[in-house]
Amino acid sequence: MVKHIVTFKLTGTPEERARVAAAFRDALLALPSQIDVLQSMEVGINENPAESWDVVLIAVVPTLADVAIYANHPAHVAAAGLLAGHKADRACVDYEFCCRRLSRQYGERGLGIRSGCL
């Protein structure tokens, strides 16, 4: 399994950043039902004004190749388009992890079983 973690720094006033972040979050949270390779999606909006990053997403896909499938899917491209003109910076980390403990939580749904890490 692969975790795809992305943080975003947005431009604009605090109110504008909050509005854009909420719309982006809502669009991202709809993606698992639209993109087959997307096992899960978590999105957080920063609540600490002392920190400089506004949004983080954590997506789980079976393989590193699936990150590209997810990234190029039209639904993801549309969600990413919501940040047009509002994105100051982006940082990303993709890493493989073994989901043995997740498979206990999710059972035969296949987290990890399909990717062979068990």
Language-model features and meaning:
Residues 1-54, 62-69, 95-118:
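Short S/T/G/P-rich N-terminal loop/turn motif that feeds into the first structured element of a domain
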Residues 64-93:
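C-terminal structural segments of small proteins and small subunits
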